């Protein structure tokens, strides 16, 4: 790594090298993000020049140390320099970029710019997140076919990112030159969409066409990596388009502002062509044979998402796929929704020019002898055309302000009109509306007069033009009017005239950036105009759109004292108004200088300690600006809090220390109110910490000598200034600390001493300095590490040798049981290893707590020289750690043939295996290292693959299997087709491991095709269970389709009478089932349990498959079919307690009364299983309850029906009714013969009467409850049945669904059984209450009808 390759002690790293160094420590992206995000946070900071980058860097540097503690290892890696230096550089570039973007956009380009910035933000955000991971993908892909394609994607993406960043921070002139280079980056990126070999499009389409990005199984690591590369490349492709649009838009706008309309047209045209070309590539042309890249990538994503082998919800792949599908769909919609970037038609210049107005020259730009030309541009909503050619020149002679006559545009577009005198810069002079044919060129001249610095001439011309009809409300660049122009020039006579021509509210008219005339006047220092506008009642506190600045902010920033005074005369002025970032006008006044500050300080309402959103006060800014006169002016108020802290708890002194301002630091320290030991939050860093951290030795030395500075103050993690001085290699500061008696054994919270830090640092010379001061070289950290440990484990060879020369203890062990020799081995420090072994050779085979010897650690890291040295010194070549890993296994896994040969020659045990039984040969096979496989096969005197391998006996339980068996199995399982081919041709025996079956099991279609098509293997194999059985069981649809299309028998027995479809059903592979169903499966075939595929689906709880089979009615499936035990699907669903399946079967009409071989219905089984939910559901859906009780109690126990009339005639209902209501156990008797002949019906009106009657006659004997249980059940059933008849008569399905009949029956039975007969009436009535819509008189009629119908 770079950390190890860099010469120790070398300090002059470039910024790029530092960035690379810290990238290894995973810091780089954080700093880049800080640099980007700070722009928004401090966008309106009232400080200019490079100081902006400096303050931003200083403010955000606290992030480097605030995430919990100052990361010692990151800082020691040199990264402490990166936050400050790099953030400043990033910010300077970003501010250059912002300066370019703040230039006014032409109206034609504003919408394009918005679209590009919006879209590129979404794409680039996720692309940056993928960037680092893509490096890992690149390193791990070694496939000969795929690697070149992925490498092309990587090379292009890196070039794109590098060039984009390289031009980003250029100054305007350099930026333009770079973009306009012949055959430069714009041309190269445009060609990225062509099929050229070095383009980006070529590898992307190759990956898609060859299906390299479609995994064949969950273990298809290569395909998943290629998929990642495809997504990364596609997002890069989209980013390239938006980058090009951004640059061509910028160039067009640049030349528009310069007035070079020919160049404007050229880049405007390029802008549209780029969009249309990329649009065609990305979303196609709309024809079926021309799909765009996005559609093809989306198809790949959907294919992967729908792969049945993916346990998507469990491994996070599903979330990633959905995110990318949504992103690409969003981009596609965005691009498709934009037909083109510009109007395709370039307008013809039909202008006929005549001087009809009596306006004589000279006036404004109109001077005799000049020539004037006009050009036009179409504008339609957000689309604009190119600008037309210039009209023929017309000489100016005595008259000005001509009339242009143009035909009305038939498509009703507006027309922008441009004017150019001689070779001067063109100007937009107006806009012609769709129905307007005449245009008088006068409004722009009125606007220009207001800008005339000669106020007398300007006013005279203004009066003339206004009199001749010029429009004072006409708008020009950035939406500015004549009011803005007069405010900027300070022409008070014109402004006075304007105030009499319009209402006061029009004087508040903002331009496109929110600047009103009073903003412009304040920013220009035109106090008289400000005063005039205030008198006319304009809004004094109005704010600009972007930064929310008031006129007072602008005047303060410019230092315009008189303008400030005029503004302050308004009683409505808010002197403490905040801008977007919370800065008040006083903050801005820091830039304006001492005079404007004094004016502010004298105001009663001023808040001298006002804080911005980030907590910065004006005093902070003065110190950051290193402007002591301004700071002194603020201090003169006697009200400034010199210890005020920002959001990171940083004072002005912190910033002075960070920025290295020695004289300002001295001034601050001399203030009696200063607290020099305030610490930042949460890093707890003092000003002294920061001075050392940022290597300002003069400031640090001054603070160390200051009496009111605590030199031993601890930051978060227990880091003192001494620790930082060591980390940063500040020898001068260390000497001073030694002189003033600082304790050199100070420890951090993790017990790092200065010597520990020196041993890890890039300043090894500090080690001897500390040792000379008496530092304890045997001190240990919390993890048990000595300085020598840290030197070796951090790869610091020079530091380790210095310590060894001072006779430190080389046998100390840390918490992992490791000695310094282990660290030297792990980091390839040959010289250190030699030095230790020369002192003590016994450490050669010392094992740590993981049983790793130095040799094993060196092998794991591939440090060849160290390995050979250890072996030459007699190290155990067959050493194994706790997981069984040995040197030979490590190199075979990595594919290092030379080292495998070396270890063979050194008589390593070639049959040594890890704890999983994997030897070097299996590792070579599994990782596709054919060269090692061939070498091993050639070394027959050392390695014989026909030997029995008992290390993997559990994988081959029925017999002893040879290495060859496991090797073939591994080659197939891990989809190493080249090794499979080698084995097959070498062995000439297809029986070993059954490669055809194994390929089907793991879904490796290419291997399957090779064996069938090139080796002529029978698709049904030679075993009872066919390859189709394996493929179906494991859900490999593509393999299933291939086998069937090549004649595989779909009804072949897979064992136990099961076929391929049964296998697919058992694992719930719906797509496989659907395919097999369409290709001749016998659905009537039964397995050994007598179950058809349908019954198997139910018993396996494969709901989707069961529903599919029923819905599709495959081969007239009988939903009531029974297995050998006469059980239906309903029985099976009840056994498995699958209520969802039960509801499905009931929905499709299964017979719930069928009894199995044990005379049980499904309801009986549910009852036996005591599953109340299923019992209640089946009871509710079983229709007439009578069927249930016939089987339980026999026909005799049911109530016999008869006509109601005999009962009605024989009883006085009205007379008996009160007694019925109170009837209970006391008056109950056995059910009489008379009652047994009553027809118990359930009309709504008679429910009450019937229940009273039953109550009076009695159902239950007081003498014997158990003896009457059958009768009670029958009575409850009869009542419930008649109640159900009532519900059925309503012809209201929703009403019937609201009543749970099983619940009603249960409650009625309970009431009867307990003798609470009077409760039956409210039970039934409460069930009816929610659905009854009949009034009492309607119920009486209904009862009468029903009674008559039963008579």
UniProtKB/Swiss-Prot annotation:
Annotated Gene3D superfamilies: Ankyrin repeat-containing domain (1.25.40.20)
Signal peptide range in chain numbering: 1-7
Positions of the propeptide removed during maturation: 1188-1351
ANK repeats: 446-477, 478-509, 513-542, 547-577, 581-610, 614-644, 648-678, 683-711, 717-746, 750-779, 783-812, 816-846, 850-879, 883-912, 916-945, 959-991, 992-1019, 1023-1052, 1056-1085, 1089-1119, 1125-1154, 1158-1187
Lineage: Eukaryota, Metazoa, Ecdysozoa, Arthropoda, Chelicerata
Misc. comment: Is the main neurotoxin responsible for the human envenomation syndrome known as latrodectism that results from bites by Latrodectus species.
PANTHER family noted in UniProt: ANKYRIN REPEAT AND PROTEIN KINASE DOMAIN-CONTAINING PROTEIN, ANKYRIN REPEAT-CONTAINING PROTEIN-RELATED
Entry comment describing in which tissues the protein is expressed: Expressed in venom gland, cephalothorax, and abdomen tissues from both males and females.
GO cellular component: extracellular region; host cell presynaptic membrane; membrane; other organism cell membrane
Cross-referenced InterPro entries: Ankyrin_rpt, Ankyrin_rpt-contain_sf
Chain positions covered by the region annotation Helix H8 is the probable transmembrane region of the tetrameric pore inserted in the target cell membrane: 226-245
Complex and partners: Homotetramer in membranes.
Function: Presynaptic neurotoxin that causes massive release of neurotransmitters from vertebrate (but not invertebrate) nerve terminals and endocrine cells via a complex mechanism involving activation of receptor(s) and toxin insertion into the plasma membrane with subsequent pore formation. Binds to neurexin-1-alpha (NRXN1) in a calcium dependent manner, adhesion G protein-coupled receptor L1 (ADGRL1, also termed latrophilin-1 and calcium-independent receptor of latrotoxin (CIRL)), and receptor-type tyrosine-protein phosphatase S (PTPRS), also termed PTP sigma.
Modification(s) after translation: Processed by furin-like proteases at both the N- and C-termini.
Disulphide bond pairs: 401-1054
Family: Belongs to the cationic peptide 01 (latrotoxin) family. 03 (alpha-latrotoxin) subfamily.
The entry's keywords: ANK repeat, Cleavage on pair of basic residues, Disulfide bond, Exocytosis, Membrane, Neurotoxin, Presynaptic neurotoxin, Repeat, Secreted, Signal, Target cell membrane, Target membrane, Toxin, Transmembrane
Swiss-Prot/TrEMBL domain comment: The H8 helix is predicted to insert into membranes and form pores by assembling into tetramers. The helix is contained within a helical bundle domain that undergoes significant conformational changes during pore formation to allow exposure of the H8 transmembrane helix and transition of the toxin from a soluble monomer to a transmembrane tetramer.
Region called Furin-like endopeptidase recognition region, residue ranges: 4-7, 1184-1187
Any one of the GO BP annotations: exocytosis
GO molecular function: toxin activity
Native organism: Latrodectus hasselti (Redback spider)
Pfam families: Ank_2, Ank_4
Predominant subcellular localization, coarse grouping: secreted
Localization (cell): Secreted; Target cell membrane
The name this protein goes by in its record: Alpha-latrotoxin-Lh1a
